Swiss-Prot record:
This is E3 ubiquitin-protein ligase arkadia. Keywords: Cytoplasm, Developmental protein, DNA damage, DNA repair, Isopeptide bond, Metal-binding, Nucleus, Transferase, Ubl conjugation pathway, Zinc, Zinc-finger. Zn(2+) binds at residues 902, 905, 925, 928. It comes from the Eukaryota. E3 ubiquitin-protein ligase required for mesoderm patterning during embryonic development. Acts as an enhancer of the transcriptional responses of the smad2/smad3 effectors, which are activated downstream of BMP. Acts by mediating ubiquitination and degradation of SMAD inhibitors such as smad7, inducing their proteasomal degradation and thereby enhancing the transcriptional activity of TGF-beta and BMP. Specifically binds polysumoylated chains via SUMO interaction motifs (SIMs) and mediates ubiquitination of sumoylated substrates. Disulfide bonds: none annotated. Signal peptide: none annotated. Belongs to the Arkadia family. A motif (SUMO interaction motif 1 (SIM)) lies at residues 280-284. It catalyses: S-ubiquitinyl-[E2 ubiquitin-conjugating enzyme]-L-cysteine + [acceptor protein]-L-lysine = [E2 ubiquitin-conjugating enzyme]-L-cysteine + N(6)-ubiquitinyl-[acceptor protein]-L-lysine. It is an enzyme of class 2 (transferase). GO terms for biological process: DNA repair; epiboly involved in gastrulation with mouth forming second; prechordal plate formation; protein ubiquitination.
Amino acid sequence: MKSEVSSDAPKRQENLKGVLLNPEAIGASKSFPKEVEMIASKVSNEFSHLCSDTNKQQRDLNSNGTEQEKNLVVHKKRKNQQAGTSYAQSCEVKENQRLLRLQPQSDEDNDSSFSDCISSPSSSSHFGDSDTMTSDEDKDNPRRYSPAGVNATPRTQSARAQKWPRPHTDSVSSLVMKRPCYQVSSLRRPLHRKRFVKNVSSQRTQKQKERMMLQRKKREVLARQKYALLPSSSSSSENDLSSESSSSSSTEGEEDLFVSPGENHQDGTTLPSGGMDEDVVVIEASSTPQVTANEEINVTSTDSEVEIVTVGETYRSRTTLGHPRSHWGQNTQSGRTQEQRTRNRVSTVIQPLRQNTTEVVDLTVDEDDPTVVPTTSGRVESQPVSTVSSNTSTSEPASDSASGPLGSRGSAIPEIPPIPPNSNTVGTIADDSRTSTSGTNVDGGPPAMPRLPSCCPQHSPCGGSSQNHVLGHPHSSCFPPHSHHFPHHHHHHHQSSHPGVPLSPSFRDSHCPVERNAAVPPPCGATSSSGSTYHDPQALPVDLSNNGIRSHGSVSFHSTSAFDPCCPGSSSRSTVYGHQSTTSTAQTMAIDGYGSSMVAQAQPPPPTPLSSCRHYMHAPYTSLTRPLHHQTSSCPHSHSNVGDYVIAHQVPFISPLPSLAATHAVPPPPPSHHLSTAAAPQHLSTSHQSMSHHISATAPATQRLHTHEVIQRMEVQRRRMMQHPTRAHERPPPHPHRMHPNYGHGHHIHVPQTMSSHPRQGPERSAWEIAIETGVTAAPYQTGPLHTHLAHYHAPPRLHHLQIGALPLMVPDMAGYPHIRYISSGLDGRSFRVPFRGNFEELIHLEERLGNVNRGASQGTIERCTYPHKYEKVSTDWFSQRKLHSKQDGEEATEEDTEEKCTICLSILEEGEDVRRLPCMHLFHQVCVDQWLITNKKCPICRVDIDTQLPTES
């Protein structure tokens, strides 16, 4: 290896520059996407000072030998790198330590330590190394390739051979020793390598292709050997191998890149994912630019390679745009964008297939909370498998491969105890979608998804932010302890269904730190195949309720989890049901994983998790929103009412609702049958019939109250009512027709006070009543207890005559009426009296006001319609005329006849008094008539309305 690498790095650099200066080659190769170009330019600008020629010269002189060796080793890593970026980080950390020590370790040590990285296709050490290596390699290659591609071939071949197979200890040891030089090499000519590679990439020979094939075979053999050691490696390893082979050899061009000048190119590709990670560990600044250059180069390479690069780009691009790899840095803030987290997580998702569980633990270190999540090897395996396939192959193959891994996963998962069966798949899917939507994710990913509180170690947020995940599936990793068994196969949701969905970060943390970031914004097009739309942003990877069992093939309850951290104490933690994947694989997966991966379902989950995981209904799906019973029952599983209640599991209540905390033991295998609303009797145990944990839409089925119990309750109510005689006599006499269920609703509930305020004792108290006391609003109508209460509204004496059969009929008829809401809101006398009394008083006042408006006149109306003036006695002529007439009539005219009186006060009108003449010409004192008109607009004498027009003669 060393002998092949020439020590005159500066010369190589010069050669490389010469190649780069070749405009034709550059133009020809310059086919990479705008994104990459932008990133490359940005990186070059940012890091120009770091990568200045003088610095490069010095670095070259200082680390020629080490870099050269490193370059060879990098090939090896680079190959690994194709598989995935995630594992690289852990390997980088390990190897960086060695590098810092700069101690030449024995070949065996190096091989073993590096074997992890090498063994896993995604080992990240190659990333950082590849970056370094590529730059060095570029130096070597320019000499070899620019003169002739042939020279490069032997070297590249040897490099390739070492690159993948661990057996080459030389490369490993040299690589380990050389690692310290990463900084120099990585900083060095980020862009040069790209261009040069482009020129070289065109040079491909049949020999190179053959070498690629051989190399591929070797890798497969190694992979099989590695997987033979893993517990459930059989299926996943095959998938991994196939995906691996596809990634490495999906296009011969890719292999050519390895073998030939393309090799540098390949390195560049690897670099974006791995170089970033490792370099960042060593030199954050340099790593980003390197990544950019590498990404560009990758783009120019063949399709499969580009895809791989795309994965890297997605991670990288996010990071490249400004986030130096902080995956290992604990200084990273929880607020860092999800892009960053997603990238890191994704790399984790891409974890090497060959990695052991302990190694995986290292990888899962979370940026924000470095708690290491020991993920079992099984999880890792399946994850890398699907990931590799998704990354390597085009989006279509990705979905296929993903499905394959899922299937294999189903078998493998049982062996893996607490690992959510689908989380890895999700991660892979996430990778897949990420590859397809790298451009989208580059600029900004959805904010990092909140991590579940550490109190719920079992709820490790799902490792994968699959496209489906983005939809807000409670992450499968969250499944565990919560009693609601719904293995989320949502991970199995069609991987390809949401290519454009920003992937939610795949959380591996089993510790569920409570620091929840903003929920991932629903991806625009990301609707699970089930057709359920993205749930609220709140749909954070929440409850692990195993939806798999419950899942209706077509109904995807995206559980929007009202995302309360599932701290043991927080009863509010709502888990949402992960959307049920419609894919059959998911179904079987969920069931298989159910036994093994789900926390022992047979044993009732500890009450604490139960209380914490209260499932709220998904708002969009609740056709009959009944938030009530959710709060009511301790751990009510909000069945999003998608048209059917999924009463998958009987929930026998262990405690008679001493508190809202739910402590219902979950029967080990929750029945997977889904009852539709129409015929889903809510399982109200007879003893707790009043506790309508899940209120089914059909009242009759729900009502399981025995006749004698109903009669007893009625009697109790009647007695209570009799204790309040004032209320009793206030009730209108019961009318027989009112007993009919169809009687005009609301009329028979005249006096709500019948419901006495005495709290019911023990079993009498229904769940919704308890909810009412706790201030929870009740469902629009409660089937079971409600009937008896409705009966109570009828006249007490006749209650015992009410036939039980009629009661269920009442509910459907009354469902839409407001009084039902009052009843459901609280049948305790206390709750009812206040609202009803207030309403009655308001009605009285309203009636009075309306009466005033209808009968009385405002002062303005009075002034407008009447004629106020000073009273004047009629002229003598008029009196004389009257006297004459009266005399003629034989009557004596007296003075009294000539005087006018106010008919209201019956006093004679005096000269100069304020009087008001109404349109009817009647005259009154202003004071007297105004008081009258305020209450009645009509004349007190003739009852003519003052609004009428005055006669013209007046």
